[in-house]
């Protein structure tokens, strides 16, 4: 992508106000729609990422997606794929992608601070051939890269992994039911095949605490 296409007028105005146009132009030279080997390795080592979407009217939504390392796959030099697991049933991200495929992804290694940004166009497919590779995936999202670039890590706080979520599907092992689905407030609202309707299915704490 040419630098002239990288920035819109308002971004240019701020760059000129703070004398960063030259710096911005140089950084733009590092963006590409190609996912190189080092980026591929970084993405496929992650166990989480953030995804930004917006609806048909432009209202934004930001979500966290987690899984086992490797749950995001680089299927070719321009495309990543990831599963959508059972969630809260709102389908805010998937619904947005169905009406507005433009998407932003942010991958971070919080132990060393490295981060990678990717924007592109997404597609949602319940019959994607990759679906069978993911235990209990409802469907698969693929994102075709428009821009991929590494980002400065100076303001990333460092964290260490304590424990991965027990709710992430793993092979033939049934993950526990989130305990919020057992609350009386949700009685009569769950899908007919939701594991939470099985009184013998184990549950685990997941209610938000504030």
Question: Where is each model-derived feature located?
Answer:
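Binding-site signature for planar aromatic cofactors or substrates
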Residues: 1-210
